Design a protein with these regions (language model features):
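A structural signal for short secondary-structure junctions
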Residues: 28-29, 55, 108-112
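Acidic/histidine-rich catalytic neighborhood
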Residues: 62-63, 67-119
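Short, well-ordered loop/turn and helix-capping segments at boundaries between secondary-structure elements
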Residues: 7, 43, 59-66, 80-88, ...
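Composition- and surface-driven signal marking solvent-exposed, interaction-prone regions
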Residues: 14-19, 47-52, 70-76, 89-92, ...
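Acidic/His-rich, divalent-metal-binding segments that scaffold phosphate/diphosphate chemistry
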Residues: 2-50, 65
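Regulatory modules associated with amino-acid/nitrogen control
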Residues: 97, 101-195
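Feature representing long, continuous alpha-helical segments
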Residues: 3, 32-39, 51-59, 72, ...
Length: 195
């Protein structure tokens, strides 16, 4: 996980442009690294590994003299490190109630940024073969929709985002036959594919 975080911080500004920008804007990168170190520490100890890891990370962070706020954030990240992946893949992220509930969990955009980056790097480290554009898209959509909610911005429906992107693609094509062919392909996919 740490290796992926470091690489995302230095490289990957093409494949992970948004994430590269986010990781380099974090107020305290060490919080992300410590959450990455502790997120699976509770595995094999009997019980919920997220809860065990959260308690362990909180104790450690206090012991090394981190502020209570930083210690709480690390512990919260460890406790919730599976939430974003689970919600993005198992719930309907186009449902405003899903976004509202997740926004209540994360509370603010800073926590959201940290959790999003931890989630992506955890999935990529666990099994790189499981990481794909579809999962990335779901996570990114959940992130962007939740960020809009937390910033009190109007949340654009996925259908509207999808239509805008399709129109941009159509505008770049020259021939009518290309547009017709592409239109038939677009009908094979739901709106979430284009968001």
């Amino acid at each position: 996980v740490i290796k992926n975080m470091r690489r995302m911080q230095i490289h990957f500004d093409n494949e992970f442009k948004l994430e590269h920008e986010l990781i380099n804007r974090l107020p305290k990168i060490e919080i992300l690294y410590l959450a990455g170190l502790f997120h699976d520490l509770g595995k094999g100890k009997g019980g919920n590994h997220s809860e065990i890891g959260a308690a362990t990370s909180l104790s450690f962070a206090k012991r090394i003299g981190l502020s209570l706020g930083d210690a709480d954030l690390i512990s919260w990240l460890v406790l919730n490190h599976l939430q974003m992946s689970s919600i993005s893949q198992k719930k309907d992220i186009s449902d405003s109630q899903t976004i509202n509930s997740f926004a209540e969990l994360v509370i603010d955009t800073e926590r959201l940024d940290y959790l999003y980056l931890l989630t992506i790097n955890d999935i990529r480290a666990t099994n790189p073969a499981l990481w794909n554009g579809w999962k990335h898209g779901l996570l990114r959509d959940l992130f962007l929709l939740t960020r809009s909610k937390l910033n009190k911005e109007p949340i654009k429906p996925l259908k509207e985002i999808s239509m805008h992107r399709k129109n941009n693609i159509f505008a770049s094509l020259k021939g009518v036959s290309e547009k017709e062919l592409l239109k038939s392909y677009f009908e094979l996919f739901d709106d979430s594919y284009f968001t």
